Amino acid sequence: VDLAAARARQASFFAQKDPTGGVALILGAGNVSSIPPMDAFTKMFVEGFVCLIKMNPVNEWVGPILEKALAPMIDRGYLRIVYGGGDVGAYLCKHPTVADIHITGSDATHDLIVWGPPGAERERRKAAHDPQLKIPISSELGNVSPVAIVPWTYRDAELAFIARNIVTMITNNWLGDLASAPDLGFIRE
């Protein structure tokens, strides 16, 4: 993807005269309760989907709170929140009304959704680039959010600011937060 292609796609949903939309399934990991609604907002307001959030059983307790907070969107039919385990998630991933999936979680869950259960058939699918999932999926898996420090002439205050933010991100990751930075890369000229 080059800059021109990225700019052409930026906010492209808003330029469509008759957007297609559809139902986006949000499968949130259980460690950060704020991520599923944030992912739903992105799918709704940036990409034009109505959303179905399937709560992780670890965070089912926050579902009623989200239902109350998001009642205006739920009442108008733009959002639903459902509960259950992996069986419910598997059913929803294959439901004919689901047009898009976003998952926050493990690569094992992602691969189960995209390629199927472990075994010879999964390996065949991977080798042939033939996923069992035939709809788009976006994934935030196992914390693959590196921080890159690019070469620049930084002032001391800028370096201190960057350092504080990196320490905060790494500290957050002690909680297993998929959105915090686990890796730090230095780019040399």
Name these PLM-found stretches:
Residues 8-11, 86, 169-170:
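Short alpha-helical segments and helix-capping/turn motifs at coil-helix boundaries
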Residues 58, 62, 105, 158:
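Short acidic-hydrophobic sequence patches enriched in Asp/Glu that either
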Residues 28, 38, 55-56, 83, ...:
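Glycine-rich, histidine-containing beta strand-loop boundary motifs that form or position
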Residues 33, 83-88:
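Short acidic loop-to-helix transition motifs that present clustered carboxylates
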Residues 67-74, 78, 88-90, 94-96, ...:
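ALDH superfamily catalytic-core signature
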Residues 1-77, 144-145:
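Conserved small-residue-rich beta-alpha loop and adjacent elements
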